[in-house]
Design a protein with these regions (language model features):
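Conserved polymerase palm-domain catalytic core
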Residues: 1-99, 103-124, 134, 138-139, ...
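Right-hand nucleic-acid polymerase module
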Residues: 44, 69, 76-86, 110-120, ...
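Flexible helix-coil linker/hinge segments at domain or subdomain boundaries
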Residues: 125-129
């Protein structure tokens, strides 16, 4: 598993064919009421699916699942043996889809390239989706006997994944660090962390937790600030729930 191909769909949400999406849903969803409601919401969008809609995220993943299954189950080559028999061999070993980004991993450069071309063709012909032509074929990071890195890390989902460690993508790291440094200043003064800042800290914490960022977390008290941010959000949620309950009682 030394070779990877990475691509992404051009304007994925607006490009989704709603007619095909509905047909896919009709085949697999048997609840008529749920289908009716979902179709009404889909038809409320101007073109394709609406960017930012919570429903669109799920529908986009569902639509792209067809491409995932094609890549995971249909990408084979046939090898003919001397005795006349043929054998199907997988072109790739691993498939990863994350929203409109996808990654194919295999052992042979020619096989991974062929798999990528077949997947691009499938997505265009059967899903009406266009993969950006600048998709990348590269050798995955590996370490020689002297401990030197070669190839490229896998840059996906906000992480840069090396053979022996995982880093947070630089742009995300810098924004996350600013959020925690700012929240830390409020904590040092004994002040409550502003709600929007608390939400940002909670969102960024996942990247730091699931990467090799132990030094950063210790230096900037990330874990302690995260707990303070959680308590801040929890208190606010309780206030809203209590206010909502009072309004219901008043209405009754």
């Amino acid at each position: 598993t030394r070779i990877a191909a990475k691509g992404d769909v051009r304007k994925c949400y607006p490009s989704i064919n709603r007619r095909k999406l509905k047909r896919m849903l009709e085949k697999q969803v048997r609840n008529e009421d749920l289908l009716y409601l979902t179709f009404v919401l889909i038809d409320s969008f101007n073109q394709g699916l609406s960017i930012g809609s919570y429903l669109s995220q799920w529908l986009c993943n569902y639509y792209l699942s067809a491409a995932y299954h094609y890549a995971a189950e249909k990408l084979f080559k046939r090898k003919k043996h001397r005795d006349g028999t043929t054998e199907e061999i997988r072109l790739i070993n691993h498939v990863l889809f994350y929203m409109d980004d996808f990654l194919l991993i295999g052992s042979r450069k020619a096989d991974v390239r062929k798999a990528m071309k077949l997947l691009v063709k499938y997505m265009n012909e059967y899903l009406d989706l266009t993969v950006k032509p600048d998709w990348k074929l590269f050798q995955i990071d590996w370490i020689d006997k002297d401990g030197k890195h070669h190839g490229e890390p896998i840059d996906m989902m906000g992480f840069k994944i090396y053979r022996d460690h995982t880093e947070v993508r630089r742009s995300i790291f810098l924004r996350g660090r600013r959020a925690f440094v700012k929240a830390g200043k409020y904590a040092e003064k004994g002040k409550a962390i502003p709600l929007d800042l608390a939400y940002r800290c909670i969102a960024y914490y996942g990247w730091f937790k699931h990467s090799d960022s132990e030094y950063f977390r210790e230096k900037y008290n990330v874990d302690k600030i995260f707990e303070k941010a959680k308590r801040r959000v929890s208190r606010e949620s309780k206030i809203y729930r209590k206010a909502g309950s009072c309004n219901l009682e008043y209405a009754a």
